[in-house]
Amino acid sequence: MGQHGITISQGQPYLFGMVVKTQESVKFTVSLTDRTGKNVYCRATSVGGGDDWTRLEVELTPQAADSDADLRICWENAGYVCVGAVSLLPKDHFHGMRRDVVEAMKDLGIKVLRWPGGNFAGEFNWMDGLLPADMRAPFQSYLGLETQPHTMGYDFSEMNTDDFIALCREIGAEPFITINPCWNTPDENAAWVEYCNGDVSTPYGKLRANRGHQEPYNVQFWSLGNEFGYGHMEGDNTPAGYCQIALENGKKMLEASPGLSLCSSGPYPNKEWAEFSAKPLAGISQMISQHYYGYDPHYTDLSTVEEEYNRCMASVSRMRELIHQSRQWLEPSIRISMDEWNVWYAWYRPSSVTDGIYAALVLHMLMEEAEKSGIALACHFQAINEGMLCVKPNHVSLTAQGQVFSWMNRWHMGNRLCSASQEAVITVDREGRVSATVVNAAFHRKKPVDFSSFGPCSEAVLFSSDTVLPPSSFTQSNVLDQAAGGTLQMPPHSVLFLRF
């Protein structure tokens, strides 16, 4: 038995694992070969089995690279062999995740990481993660498209709470956990909070400690479900009905860990939900969740590329309008968690410079609106293969959005905001260094920039591209010499980073 189409790297050690049950002890041979099976890149044997489930592990180090390799599992004895979970991971994996992807997430400077969703939060049961990974039952998502085409719509709950917290700590992000108020009871969701934040004197805090994590995780941010009110999420989608569910869950969660920052769900901006959900929940939840996806340019007709691009850029202003609408209807004490935003083409779409310019405008707009519109959190959805990182079987790279995120973080994170608009942001750090980012979102026009009043420029980097069509990313250029005179002409669809 085996599997085709596996990408392997030469000299990379892999850990193979398999759970089996047999009538008697069996000798297994595991190998990585080419598609025909004639060229064997590596092979290992293991003896095991029996009338109870047993996990067998071997290490495999292929002597050649192949993007269409076969994993082959053979056994010598005739008889009954029942195979459960099978896995093949790089030996240097991080809690089942690829190390290169984790390092790329760290380099992006992500400060808040939301999990398990998104729509997936409506199907996730955190208690499944208390089992060993090989024993977690697969389930078929009713939103199966979100895990297609890799698993035929099934999910295997491979990441549990401990893995997620480890990831957050590794990349330096605050965890933001979304509960499932439809299929988990208030007591079960309160137990999740206790597992994360309780000390060893509590039942679930003791369980966490017994699993190797003595100190509480102290998770501050919790979302009371995802996208209730839209109709695609299971559960009560009326404002009053959701309010009751959220209230029951939130109270139990606060009993387990007082002082949590709870975020309520809903189809915001929505006047009815603001009145009959957000307002009565204000005693336990001081944030509402708001999502926005910009216009998705189809780029199927070359004669309409400029029109499609401009509509996408204009949708940033629409996002601002919707934030203002929510602010108008919400109580002043309730803040906004803009915890999903992106420009959305389709699942598994190739990224483009269009996305990068859109992201730069949104980040500028959020910095401008954060204080006056009461935006507490903002989460781009999602990092892997829908946004910042392009992850392939054997490498990971920044998309145009990822390039913008990485440099915006490098340029502005931790600084004091001096001035912000959709087109330009200026910040100053503790040493008095001034950092500026400027966006030229025009499709054809150049943009003159005069920064002579700031004095000599110490750094000047331009992100530019000849095309906005997918797949595309920015070319990064050092333009310090061109900026020496205090002025610069920005090309169309470009981003300029200046430091003084």
Q: At which residue positions do the language-model features occur?
A:
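Extracellular and organelle-lumenal recognition/adhesion modules and their flexible linkers in secreted
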Residues: 1-157, 174, 190, 240, ...
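An active-site-proximal structural segment forming one wall of the substrate-binding cleft
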Residues: 90-110, 157, 164, 185-224, ...
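Carbohydrate-binding surface patches
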Residues: 423-455, 463-466, 493-496
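C-terminal beta-strand-rich structural cap/linker in extracellular carbohydrate-active enzymes
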Residues: 477-500
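Noncatalytic carbohydrate-binding groove/subsite architecture in carbohydrate-active enzymes
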Residues: 69-77, 238-356, 362
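Aromatic- and acidic-residue-enriched carbohydrate-binding clefts of CAZyme catalytic domains
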Residues: 119-161, 201-232, 296-301
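Aromatic/acidic polysaccharide-binding cleft in carbohydrate-active enzymes
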Residues: 334-427
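The substrate-binding groove and active-site-proximal loops of carbohydrate-active enzymes
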Residues: 87-95, 140-157, 175-183, 225-243, ...
